[in-house]
Amino acid sequence: LPCFKCKSCREGNYATCENYDYYGSRRDGGMTEYIAVKRWNLVKMPSGLSYDEGAMCEPVSVARHAVGKLNISKGESVFISGAGPIGLIAGQWAVLLGAKKVYYTDIDKRKLEFAKTLGFYEWENGTVTDCALEGTGYSNALQKCLETVKPHGRMVLMGNPAGEVTMSQNTYWQILRKELCINGTWNSSYNDVINDWHESIKAMADGELNVKPLITHKFPLSECNTAFKMMKNKTEFYNKVILNMQGAD
C-alpha cells in the first residue's frame, strides 16, 4: 500500500515508499476469509494454478527480487545462507537464471537435508562461490557469506534481522580486500515496467518454478492456533505452512 506521493513512489519504486502500509503486517486483515482491497492490489491467477501456489506468490516475488540483484551469469555458483521457504525459492530462481550449483548453510540440519532433496548442495568448508545471498539477518551468517564469495564477487543482503548485527574487523576487511559489490533488497518490484508478482505467477503457471514441495503443512483456518503453536514450538519439521480457507486437503 504505497502512498504514491513520495519520491520513491513517483519513480515507481513502491517498495521503498517512505509511508507504505501493508495488509497483514502494519494493517489488519491479511488473515481474514474475505478482505476488500483496491484493484491495484490484485494479481490475476491464471487457470490451472492452484490456490496453494497462488498463496506462495508473495515469497516467490520477494525471492525473485533479491536474486535478480545478484546478476547471475550462466554457469556461476551461488551461496545462500538460510534454507527456509524464501531461501529455497531463491535457489530455484538462481537455477532459472543460469546458476550451475546452489549451496546452502543453515543451523537446522533438517533444512539442509530438505534442500538436498530439491537438488541443492550443502556448503562445505573451503567452497568458494561467485555470489552470495544472505537470508537470515544474523551476524555469523553475514560473515560466512563474506568468507565464501570470491574476490570481485556479488552479494545481496535479504535477511531481516531480529536484533543487532555486528561486524568484526576481519569481516569488514573481507569487503575491502575482495572489492565486493553488496546490495540490499526489500520486498519486491511491482510497477508497470518491472513486476515481480506477474513474473512469479507466470513462472509457476508455466512450470518453471515448483513451489508445491515447499508446502509441508496445510491447516484449515479453524486450526490456525494449532499451526502457530507447532511453528512456535518447532514440534516437527516444517518449511511452508498454508492456512486453507476452504479446509485443509
What kind of feature is each model-predicted range?
Residues L70, L112-L180:
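Glycine-rich cofactor phosphate-binding loops and adjacent beta1-alpha1 units
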Residues V156-V165, L180, D206-H217, N225-D249:
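C-terminal capping/lid region of NAD(P)-dependent oxidoreductase domains
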